[in-house]
Every structure is written in C-alpha cells, then in structure tokens.
Design a protein with these regions (language model features):
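Flexible loop residues that form catalytic
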Residues: 84, 127, 153, 236, ...
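A short acidic, helix-capping loop that chelates divalent metal ions and anchors anionic groups
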Residues: 87-93, 180, 212, 239-244
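Active-site acidic/histidine proton-transfer and metal-coordination neighborhood
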Residues: 10, 15-16, 20-23, 44, ...
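Structural recognition of the beta-strand scaffold that forms the well-ordered cores
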Residues: 80-81, 121, 149, 273
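Histidine-acidic metal/acid-base catalytic patches
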Residues: 2-56, 60-77, 141, 187, ...
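Glycine-rich, proline-tolerant flexible connector loops at the mouths of alpha/beta enzymes
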Residues: 82-107
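Residue-level recognition of beta-strand->loop/alpha-helix junctions
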Residues: 58, 82-83, 123, 175
Length: 303
C-alpha cells in the first residue's frame, strides 16, 4: 500500500482445468452469486493455519461494497479495508473507517454477514495524536476486527499496548520501503518497538516492500519469528527498485516459493493477506493467480 499515492470446490476444479482465467469468470458472476455466502477457495491453506485475506487497497479503483463482490467470486472471505478508501458508490466521500455513523456501521456489518465475510483486519490511522485511538478500537471491536495494521510512531506504543489488552485486539506493525520513508523498513526496527510489549503487538511484514528495499524477504521473516501477527503477501518485478510494480506471486524477485516455505518452517499460523498494488487491466486475474499460488503450495504440505 502506498498511502501517499491515493491518486474456491468450484474454484479448485476451475483452476485445475483452466487456470486463473476460470476464476476470473467466476468472480464476474458465477461461483458465489450475489447475496449468497462466499464459497471458500483455499481449503488447503486453511488446514495449515493460513487464513487468506485481501487488503482492499488492491481494489482502490472501486468501493468497499463493489470489491466485496469481486472477493466473493474469488472465494476470499476476509477483508482488510484501509481508513482512506471509499465505502459505497452512492456516497463516494464516505470512507470505510471509524468515522462511519452508527447506521452506516450496522449496514456494513449486515452486508458482511449476509455474504459470510469478515473484516479480519483494518489498516488504521494510528499516528502521534493518541486522542482518536479509542474511537479506532471501538470501531474495530464493533466490526469484529482481530488485528489493526498500522505504522505508529514509537512514543505511542505504551498507550496502544494498553488498548490492545483492554479490547483483546492485536496491533500488527506494517512496513513500507526505506525509500518511502518507512520507520519499519527493516525487521529490526519492528522488533525494537515490540521490546517490553505484550504479544498483542507484533509485525505485519510486507514482503514486496522488503524486495523494493533490496532485502531478502525470507531472511526478514526469519528475524521476525515468534513476533509475526499477519503477513502481507506481495511480489514485485525488480529487486532494490522502490518504484517496481507488483506482479502475481511467484513471478517476481521475492522467490515466493521460498517465502511460503519459510512461513511454513516458522510454523506461522494467522492471516495471510494478498495486497496487489498494480492496477492492471487484468487486475482480478492477477489476484486470482496470487490466490492459486498460495493454495497450490498449501496443497503440497503434509498436515
């Protein structure tokens, strides 16, 4: 995600015969019809404790409610909205955030429940001003969020840790690239702010931003062993280029088979969140390829 640049039985059968293109067709209107519960597309990933999610910055060219229907077609039940992204086409200035009015929150919860979907995580505005933190946690609790994803400054972690324990909600520290000015561009910086804090605070390593910085994502994950709460799954075309575009998992420089092997070797269990930043004409197909890559790998793992 670059916030400074706002500018699945059916699935598996389809993928096995026709590849990701078949998934796109189902996303357009087949596997999980409007109003029906989402048919999970990643049963093997679930068996090894990888609960697939999607960061909705991926679909920032549409609203939350529009993106929900795409994800339903892809068999993805869990979503991670970002506080600056629009909720509905009818009210484009309305953001999916703690600023929603009670009636709007009820409508959001109802739509998620009707689809059998979960707001598992939330990319939240947790910055230097602590005055709005409780409002963020109240919203997260109401929506059933298990993990807040953010990049807070070091001085607010005491307040955040207290709220995490009170609300029983995790805080996962996200990284952008070094060139983007992220405080957490390397895992050591994440571990430093976790020192002395409860296990409710940990990392949300973004593998794509590690590659953009010129770091080996698998080695970065190893450094975060025992302190990873969730992971942003992302592959990019070029190593060490901060402007390099996203590509489907396994097609870039992250060595994504090794990334998944590393997560498995570390016995990681939790949210694995696809985030795809490149608004390509074949965006849904590219995301479907990412889903397939994770599920295909998980299918090879002995449980």
């Amino acid at each position: 995600m670059r916030t400074n640049r706002l500018s699945r039985r059916d699935f598996l059968a389809a993928v096995g015969t026709c590849g990701a293109g078949a998934v796109v067709a189902s996303a357009a209107g087949g596997v999980s019809g409007e109003g029906q519960k989402v048919k999970l597309s990643t049963p093997h990933a679930e068996k090894i404790g990888w609960r697939l999610c999607c960061q909705l910055y991926t679909f920032r060219d549409r609203t939350f409610y529009e993106a929900m229907e795409v994800l339903a077609g892809l068999g993805i039940r869990r979503v991670e909205p970002a506080f600056f992204l629009p909720l509905s086409k009818e009210q484009p200035d309305l953001k999916t955030s703690e600023m929603l009015a009670p009636a709007q929150r009820r409508e959001l919860k109802r739509r998620l429940e009707d689809r059998g979907m979960l707001m598992a995580s939330y990319y939240a505005p947790l910055e230097a001003d602590t005055s709005g933190f409780r409002k963020v946690f109240d919203f997260a609790k109401e929506m059933g969020v298990e993990t807040l994803v953010a990049e807070p400054p070091a001085q607010v972690f005491e307040a955040l840790d207290s709220l995490c324990q009170e609300y029983k909600i995790n805080l996962a520290i996200h990284n952008h690239s070094e060139a983007a000015g992220s405080k957490y561009w390397r895992p050591e910086n994440v571990l430093r702010v976790c020192e002395g804090r409860s296990k409710a605070i940990g990392g949300c390593p973004d593998t794509g931003h590690y590659v953009r910085t010129g770091l080996d994502p698998s080695e970065c994950l190893k450094k975060l062993q025992g302190r990873m709460i969730c992971v942003h799954l992302k592959d990019v075309a070029e190593m060490g280029n901060p402007e390099s575009r996203d590509v489907p998992l396994g097609e870039g420089k992250a060595n994504y088979t090794q990334v998944l092997k590393t997560l498995r070797a570390l016995n990681f269990r939790g949210l694995v969140t696809i985030e795809y930043e490149h608004l390509s004409p074949q965006l849904v197909e590219d995301v479907a390829k990412c889903v397939k890559f994770v599920e295909d790998f998980a299918a090879t793992v002995d449980v």
